[in-house]
């Protein structure tokens, strides 16, 4: 069996285990897992840019904010999205976030490296400023409270039912993103990440490829925002702040950039560590920061890169003749 097939099988088994085990735990664990699943979609969307296209973005929280605020505003002001029309809100959230990414991308994709990073940072801060200052629409610093979850044949106020909804959309998102990165388009993105000049010489429109990837990542970020609004029950400028984008970036690096699943693993670990460490010490942020630093220093390929590092360090003993053949010839 090919290694890629084994990895897919492991992911499927892990997802099945989550779907079976989590609903049988307490409500706190279920809520924490649901939040991690929703945020994982944002992290995986960022990984399309970071791991597969080589574009580290600090503005991904803007798309989460678009989806979340759209959901909250429609639900509280117009009672829209609380029935079967919830699925329309999902579509609207994806499209609006993708549209915002299309606008941002016209500016950001023209830059590379640290300049791209700074432009996405600036655009993300603009989104935060709107959320913080536009009190009449966003509620300003107080945010918007969602008092009810949708009902469309099933009651999403039930934590188990809501968990399965978020889990299902997470699984679909993972499948779609996996299909994308394994497609010819996704392989072109990997080529652009490694040798953009060579891809240009081969006739690829590298700007367009990166622009499309930027828009797709924004759309999935909007989906994460729609789910996050109902998961958290409140939408505020905290969802759009810089630290949200940084968290997503660090989660992707912790799990392993360019793996998709690694981003989800990173999100689960960070959400779990936050809750656990915050009950032990008041300076839990520093402990979490130490985890990030150690990961970057000693696991630059993230947790998903551990098996490969083990394989590379494994020494297969050979006979003396093999060693002699490998030894350099000296005069």
Predicted features, each with a name:
Residues 1-331:
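Transmembrane alpha-helices and adjacent helix-loop boundaries
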